[in-house]
């Protein structure tokens, strides 16, 4: 087991440590995007619908352990991304984080998407 997996120091030079942190952040952003696209499809296709489960958010709460409020936000953001191709692309390629996407999708529309994406990237 190396130092990173056991919670100890990696011994990496700081620049390498920085590079690994930012690279992994991009991978996490892209993975989150993929997860959101799956959630949107699952909701559209009513994969969560049975005689008990009330909504996709409730299903995420039950099956993925998300707080119900966080689950509702995931579903909202997932559907919003379908209408915002530039923001979607930036998250898909790892450039934009879920936190920023969550914030901009509250107010973004196709007409304001480009300017809000520019703000989010800087």
Where are these regions (language model features)?
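Conserved C-terminal region and hinge/linker of Rieske [2Fe-2S] proteins, especially
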Residues: 1-122
